[in-house]
C-alpha cells in the first residue's frame, strides 16, 4: 500500500483520478476543491435492502466484486495537499498522496494526476500484477459496470453517467470561471442545480455575467452569504417569527453554521434538530446545518469593545430583545467612515437582529469661527466675544 509522506503538491490543479484496474479500468474522474467520495463494492450489495442508498451528489460508484473499500479524496483550497481517507468499517485511515504514483485502496488501484498533464504510467510491474490479479473477477466487466450504474438510477451507460454526473458538470463550470475560479466554490445541489458560492457582491456580479455570456447550458445559480441570509431570514420570519437568532455563517458552504441566542432560545433539542433539517432543505448545496448557541452578553460586549477601540463616542440603550448603541457627536468624515466600517464588520459576524447601531451627528457650533492656538488657547466668536474652552 502506498504510504508516501510527501505533502507538498507543486503541480497546479485541477486534478484527475484515473482507475488502473476494475471493470472501469482507464476511466477518469475530475477532482474539485474539497471532498469527493468514491463508493467501491459489489453492485448487488447496494440494493440488498430493497432500496437504493442515499449517496451524496459529489460521489462516484465503482463496481468491484472483492476487496472494495470506500474512500474520500480531499483537495485543499490552495491545492498544496491531497489527502486520501480510507473509510474502513469501524475506523478510517488518512494519508497524503503523490501525483502520478499508483495508489492501492483495498483491491482498487488508482492514480492522481494534474488535469493539464498526460497520464504517465509508472511501476509497470505493479500494474501488470494488479491487472492479472483482478482479471478473473472482471471478465464480464462491461456488464458489471452497466449494472452498477443502472442500479444507481442513472439510466444510461457508465461513460454517459460520468460525462453527465454533477461532478463533471461542476468541473465544466469550474473551467468556465477560468483563472478567477479560486474566488469561488462550485457546489452540486441535491436539486440537480449547481451553485457557485461567491465571497462578496462584486464576485457575485462577475460570476453571473460569466454564466450569462458563456455557453454553459446547465442549471446554475450564483449565491453569496448576504443574499442567502436575507432569503432564509424571510422564511424564518414566516415560520419561526419568535425565533431569536443572529445569522448563518457560510465559511464552509457545505456545512453552514446557524447562530441562535442561548439566553432567548426556548426550543428543545429535538426541535432544534427538526429546524436543522428544514434549513438543510432550504440549502440544497449543504450537507448539514450546524446550530450553535451564542451568548447575548458576548454579542453586546464585542460591539461595545469595538466602539471603544475605535475611539467613537457612543451611548448604550438596553431594551427588550436587544441593545442599541448610538454613535453621536460632531464626527468628521474620517470618524464617520471608521464607524461605518466597524458596523459593517460587526454585522457580518453577528447580524443586526440583537445589536443595532445608530449614528446621531451633531453640528460643530464652533466651526468657521476662528482658530485655537495651544492647549490654553481661545476662539474669537465675534467682536468683543471670546470663548475659552475648558479647562482653562
Swiss-Prot record:
Its main location: membrane. One of its GO terms (cellular component) is plasma membrane. The keyword Cytoplasm does not apply. It is found in: Cell membrane. The chain crosses the membrane at residues 142-162. Keywords: Cell membrane, Membrane, Transmembrane, Transmembrane helix, Virulence. It is a single-pass membrane protein. Required for invasion of epithelial cells. NCBIfam families: PrgH, PRK15327.1. This is Protein PrgH. It comes from Salmonella typhimurium (strain LT2 / SGSC1412 / ATCC 700720).
Amino acid at each position: 500500500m502506498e504510504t508516501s509522506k510527501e505533502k507538498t503538491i507543486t503541480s497546479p490543479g485541477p486534478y484527475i483520478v484515473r482507475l488502473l484496474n476494475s471493470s472501469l479500468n482507464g476511466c477518469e474522474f475530475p477532482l474539485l476543491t474539497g471532498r469527493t467520495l468514491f463508493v467501491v463494492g459489489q453492485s448487488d450489495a447496494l440494493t440488498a435492502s430493497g432500496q437504493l442508498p442515499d449517496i451524496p451528489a459529489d460521489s462516484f460508484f465503482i463496481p468491484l466484486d472483492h476487496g472494495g473499500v470506500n474512500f474520500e479524496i480531499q483537495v485543499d483550497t490552495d491545492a498544496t495537499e491531497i489527502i486520501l481517507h480510507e473509510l474502513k468499517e469501524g475506523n478510517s485511515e488518512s494519508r497524503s498522496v503523490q501525483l502520478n504514483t499508483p495508489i492501492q485502496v483495498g483491491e482498487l488501484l488508482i492514480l492522481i494526476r494534474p488535469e493539464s498533464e498526460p497520464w504517465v504510467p509508472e511501476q509497470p510491474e505493479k500494474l501488470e500484477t494488479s491487472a492479472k490479479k483482478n482479471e478473473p473477477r472482471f471478465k464480464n466487466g462491461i456488464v458489471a459496470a452497466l449494472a452498477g450504474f443502472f442500479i444507481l438510477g442513472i439510466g444510461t451507460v457508465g461513460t454517459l453517467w460520468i460525462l453527465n454526473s454533477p461532478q463533471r458538470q461542476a468541473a465544466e463550470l469550474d473551467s468556465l470561471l477560468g483563472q478567477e475560479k479560486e474566488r469561488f466554490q462550485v457546489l452540486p445541489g441535491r436539486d440537480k442545480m449547481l451553485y457557485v458560492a461567491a465571497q462578496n457582491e462584486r464576485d457575485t456580479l462577475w460570476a453571473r455575467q460569466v454564466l450569462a455570456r458563456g455557453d454553459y447550458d446547465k442549471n446554475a445559480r450564483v449565491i453569496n452569504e448576504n443574499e442567502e441570509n436575507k432569503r432564509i431570514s424571510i422564511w424564518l420570519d414566516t415560520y419561526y417569527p419568535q425565533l431569536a437568532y443572529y445569522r448563518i455563517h457560510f465559511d464552509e458552504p457545505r456545512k453552514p453554521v446557524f447562530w441562535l441566542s442561548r439566553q432567548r432560545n426556548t426550543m428543545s433539542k429535538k426541535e432544534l434538530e427538526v429546524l436543522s433539517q428544514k434549513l438543510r432543505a432550504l440549502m440544497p448545496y449543504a450537507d448539514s446545518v450546524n446550530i450553535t448557541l451564542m451568548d447575548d452578553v458576548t454579542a453586546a460586549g464585542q460591539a461595545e469593545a469595538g466602539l471603544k477601540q475605535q475611539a467613537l463616542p457612543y451611548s448604550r440603550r438596553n431594551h427588550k430583545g436587544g441593545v442599541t448603541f448610538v454613535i453621536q457627536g460632531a464626527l468628521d468624515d474620517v470618524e464617520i467612515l471608521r464607524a461605518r466600517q466597524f458596523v459593517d464588520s460587526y454585522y457580518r459576524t453577528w447580524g443586526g437582529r440583537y445589536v443595532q447601531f445608530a449614528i446621531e451627528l451633531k453640528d460643530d457650533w464652533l466651526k468657521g469661527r476662528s482658530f485655537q492656538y495651544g492647549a490654553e488657547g481661545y476662539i474669537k466668536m465675534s467682536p468683543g466675544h471670546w470663548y475659552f474652552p475648558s479647562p482653562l
